[in-house]
């Protein structure tokens, strides 16, 4: 029943006609993007839920040296309230120095929980190695863990990952090509030649001929003013322009782990017959030992006794006529009571046989 509901909902969604969407909802401006930042730091103040790994001690010792505290070479600090963590954040486009970012903090070692901890000053670097933000602050951890003396343990959610809202201050901005050049380029989130052409046509209808041209299935190039203030208002007008996206190509998407199957609107089948059923073969091996009388001159003989059982379940066959559509396909699959795993095997066989007109995608 659950499987039928999933397929029915997918059928309803994918069979809806294409509606006009704003350019800002289906495309991004090239060069206007976020950047990922990452850092390595220490969380302190943990209530005995930290770690004692070698790299934690080394990082802790290095931090003390930076504050002018030198420990003996053979001294190993006993720390239970410290954890080594990875800190990462997304830096949106156009963000300026002084603005703040949310950061996520994740334990790298054996720490049992980060609840109650405080992240010390951590440099967040970009892919180019430059520092773009500095993070510090108290963690918000939704999970928790508790452990008894007998080894019993209770864990809820993930206590080794936390967040710091507005926990990083931006120190350097990232340059974008938005304000340079004679063109702006829109990149479709889903590549499609028809949608790219329709977007260019809609922009040309608004601005005039030859103002926009599709470069490929993803990109549409638009002539833009050089003045930055004019470019902002120009883009604000374009991103709210309505475009009717092209209909999706025929696809069948199957999640082999969860059994979810989504069938696109234009999936059709050529004439085919499918048999649904199962064949169970049971092979049992039993060993028999023949032990002769102690006074006889015989030898002990070991023989194998093999029993093979075959159990064939009821087979059901259904046929598809030419041009069978989504509705008939789903109805026929439900009629034979096929489970999602069975449907996956049926779809793969139909694709190999050339009877399935559509792209079969297994994720």
UniProtKB/Swiss-Prot annotation:
Which biological process terms from the Gene Ontology are attached to this UniProt entry? bacterial-type flagellum-dependent cell motility
Q: Which domain of life is it from?
A: Bacteria
Which keywords does UniProt give here? Bacterial flagellum, Periplasm, Signal
Looking up Pfam families in the UniProt record yields: FlgI
According to the record, the signal peptide region is 1-20
Q: Name one GO molecular function term.
A: structural molecule activity
One GO cellular component term, please give it: bacterial-type flagellum basal body, distal rod, P ring
**Protein location:** Periplasm; Bacterial flagellum basal body
Assembly and interaction partners: The basal body constitutes a major portion of the flagellar organelle and consists of four rings (L,P,S, and M) mounted on a central rod.
What is the protein's known function? Assembles around the rod to form the L-ring and probably protects the motor/basal body from shearing forces during rotation.
The UniProt entry's sequence similarity note says: Belongs to the FlgI family.
What is the protein's given name?
Flagellar P-ring protein
Please give the organism. Shewanella sp. (strain ANA-3)
Its ancestry begins with: Bacteria, Pseudomonadati, Pseudomonadota, Gammaproteobacteria, Alteromonadales
């Amino acid at each position: 029943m659950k499987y039928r509901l999933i397929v029915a909902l997918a059928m309803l969604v994918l069979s809806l006609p294409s509606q006009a969407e704003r350019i800002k909802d289906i495309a991004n401006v090239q060069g206007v993007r976020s950047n990922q930042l990452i850092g390595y730091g220490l969380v302190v103040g943990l209530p005995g839920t930290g770690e004692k790994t070698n790299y934690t001690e080394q990082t802790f010792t290095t931090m003390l040296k930076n504050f002018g505290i030198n420990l003996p070479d053979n001294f190993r600090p006993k720390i239970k309230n410290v954890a080594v963590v990875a800190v990462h954040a997304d830096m949106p486009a156009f963000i300026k120095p002084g603005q703040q970012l949310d950061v996520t903090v994740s334990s790298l070692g054996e720490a049992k929980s980060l609840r109650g901890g405080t992240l010390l000053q951590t440099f967040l670097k970009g892919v180019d190695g430059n520092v773009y933000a500095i993070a510090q602050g108290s963690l918000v951890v939704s999970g928790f863990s508790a452990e008894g003396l007998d080894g019993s343990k209770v864990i809820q959610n993930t206590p080794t990952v936390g967040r710091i809202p507005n926990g990083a201050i931006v120190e350097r901005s990232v340059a974008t090509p938005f304000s340079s050049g004679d063109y702006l380029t829109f990149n479709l989130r889903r590549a499609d030649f028809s949608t790219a052409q329709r977007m260019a046509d809609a922009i040309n209808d608004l601005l005039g001929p030859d103002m926009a041209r599709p470069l490929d299935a993803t990109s549409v190039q638009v002539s833009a003013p050089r003045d930055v203030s004019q470019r902002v208002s120009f883009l604000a007008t374009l991103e709210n322009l309505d475009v009717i996206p092209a209909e999706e190509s025929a696809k069948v998407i199957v999640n082999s782990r969860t059994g979810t199957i989504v069938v696109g609107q234009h999936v059709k089948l050529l004439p085919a017959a499918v048999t649904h059923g199962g064949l169970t073969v049971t092979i049992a091996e039993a060993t028999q030992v023949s032990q002769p009388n102690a006074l006889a001159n015989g030898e002990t003989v070991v023989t194998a006794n093999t029993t093979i059982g075959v159990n064939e379940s009821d087979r059901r066959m259904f046929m598809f006529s030419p041009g069978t559509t989504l509705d008939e396909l789903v109805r026929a699959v439900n009629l034979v009571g096929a489970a999602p795993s069975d449907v996956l095997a049926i779809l793969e066989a139909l694709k190999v046989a050339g009877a399935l007109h559509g792209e079969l995608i297994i994720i």
